[in-house]
Structure formats: C-alpha cells, structure tokens
Amino acid sequence: AYPLLQITKSKLPFHFFDDLTPAIVFSKSTFVVVVNKDLPVTHLQELIQLAKTQQKNGGKQLNYASVGPGTTSNIAGEMLNQEGQISIVHVPYKSFPAALTDLISGEVQVLIAPLSSLFPMIKDGKIKAIAVSTDRRDPYLPDLPTFAEQGYPNMTFIGWNGFHLNAKTPPEIVRKIYSDTAKVISEPDFISKAQQMGYQLMSLNPEEAKEMQLNDFKKFSVIVKKSNIIVD
C-alpha cells in the first residue's frame, strides 16, 4: 500500500523509496478479476464487450468495487477501463467484506482483488473468476487465463508482502533479515499455511525487490495520472 500512497497522496511524512529500504519480498498474490456469478460473461473480452454494449445502448453501466480511492483495487479497475476503453463506474467501499458482500448480491458486478482474499468464494462458486494478473497462470487456478493471454499484456502485475527498514539501516542487518526470513518461509509449516491462503512464496533480495517496486511505481503512476486518482 505504501508505494501507492507515494503516487496518490500529494503529501506524505516520508518518501517510500528514499526513506525506506526493502529487506525481502517473501510472497506474492495474484490479483483476480471476479464478477457476480450471474453476470453473463466467462472471460475478460466478454466483460469489456458487455460494458461497451451497455454504454452504447444507454443501459445501466457496470460498476466495480474497491476498498477505497487509491487502493490497488481502485487502480486496477481504472487500468481495466483504460486498457479496455470502457467506463465501468468506481464504487469505493470502506471495507473488503462490504465490497465482497455487494459483489455476491449483485449490487456491484466487478471486483479486482488478491486471490488470497477471494479463493474460498471462488472455490464455492459464490463469485466467478475471469482473469488473473500474473504473467503466467496461477497454480491455484490453472485453468484461468491471464490478462496477457486474453489480449491485455499491459495489465500484468502482482500483489506482494515483504519487510522494509529505515534506509539508514546498516547493510549487514538488512542482509541478516533477508537470510533469516528466507529460512522461515522454506519451512514446511509456513509453506502449507501460505498455500492454504493462496500465496506463492518467493525470496526477492533487497536489490530485486527495489527493482520490482520501481517498475510497479512507474506503471501505476501512469494509470493514476490518467484517472486523476488523488487521496488527501
């Protein structure tokens, strides 16, 4: 969330890239486009075509839920609008459970969120998944095509978890945290719990983590600027 705040907030008490340094990124989560189970679409192109048809015919526009302005779910929704050249309406919620409840009931039709938060509902058939955000298919949803496979390679991104430290932290301490965390995430119990939650484990070192975060920053900055997303 903090890298996104660096993009969407005009004033912050710190600078994410100048004042913090990554020690490790230890897991990633695929983002998934999910829709209400009764929406007559099964893949991304059908969703985009439905949105265009309703806009053209003056029908009720589709809505997408987010957990608030400037969040990844909001930026991903605007990414979908820009890439698909559509205007699905943003409906911000104060909490993820509230957004998910309204998606299931049909008050909103679309949500883009981490698989780790949606996995049980997808498995139970309460919502319908139509695309994943990673460059390769997710091992937990191997039959679900990626954005790139469906013609939208610019929508490739992931969610991640990691540890950051004060930028003035001595390098040997940063490396120690990296190595200790890498050991913990290789333990069978940790792996099992991560799999149950839909997370994929990884161990990006400080240099790799910063490169990934800078690439995300550049990609999301373009979307935020075009969509005029500001959180103040």
Feature-to-residue mapping (PLM):
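Conserved helix-loop-beta element of the AMP-binding
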Residues: 21, 126-137
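Short beta-strand and adjacent tight-turn residues that come in two discontinuous sequence segments
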Residues: 25, 112-114, 132, 157, ...
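Hinge/capping helix and adjacent helix->loop/strand transition within the periplasmic-binding protein
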Residues: 3, 7-98, 147, 160-193
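An extracytoplasmic/periplasmic, membrane-proximal ligand-sensing/linker region
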Residues: 83-84, 123, 171-232
